[in-house]
């Protein structure tokens, strides 16, 4: 599911993301991934779009060439940023702050609120709204145990997960808005890029 969810520019925005994960298609994805992993996957909570925080200003696709970016150690993330001609570097999150201080990397990418939680506003002046990935958090239960429950309990669990996902999504949207305002108040620069140009650039990415 991590590789599916991490495909760049799969969603046009938050509304599209929520529409997919609350649709029959979203249910099919959860069922297929859950069956393969031995879990019952339920709900769907918005994590916010991933943005790039950087030590230097970047506004266009060309600006990313050679950019030293920390990425999660997942194949799809590495290929995404290689496609953009950056220099992706897998690092554990607890190493990223120091790596940014020492210029081992020049940036990292995560949702706004998550990036602020790691205090990247202290080492990254530029926050670039690439919005390249919208991530989904799901509720999981052991599939065998779930299937052993009475049908009415199964339905109640699914309903609770759906409700919780909607509530978490609303809170996350608010957290991202507050985080963006906080970094602006602290003197960081939030850069709006042409996300359509980026999405078009990834049109043949697979």
Language model segments and positions:
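N-terminal secretory/targeting leader peptides
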Residues: 1-16, 25-27, 31-206
């Amino acid at each position: 599911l991590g590789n599916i969810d991490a495909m760049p520019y799969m969603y046009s925005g938050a509304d599209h993301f929520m529409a997919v994960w609350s649709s029959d298609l979203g249910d099919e994805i959860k069922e297929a991934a859950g069956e393969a992993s031995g879990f019952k996957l339920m709900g769907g909570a918005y994590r916010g779009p991933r943005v790039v925080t950087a030590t230097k200003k970047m506004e266009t696709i060309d600006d990313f060439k050679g950019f030293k970016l920390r990425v999660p150690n997942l194949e799809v993330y590495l290929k995404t940023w290689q496609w953009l001609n950056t220099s992706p570097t897998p690092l554990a999150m607890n190493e990223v702050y120091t790596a940014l201080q020492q210029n081992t990397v020049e940036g990292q990418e995560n949702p706004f609120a998550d990036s602020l939680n790691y205090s990247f506003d202290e080492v990254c002046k530029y926050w670039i709204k690439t919005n390249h990935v919208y991530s989904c958090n799901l509720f999981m239960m052991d599939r065998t145990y779930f299937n052993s429950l009475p049908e009415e309990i199964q339905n109640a669990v699914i309903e609770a997960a759906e409700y919780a996902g909607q509530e978490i999504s609303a809170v996350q949207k608010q957290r991202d808005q507050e985080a963006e305002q906080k970094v602006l108040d602290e003197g960081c620069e939030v850069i709006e890029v042409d996300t359509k140009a980026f999405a078009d650039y990834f049109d043949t990415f697979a």
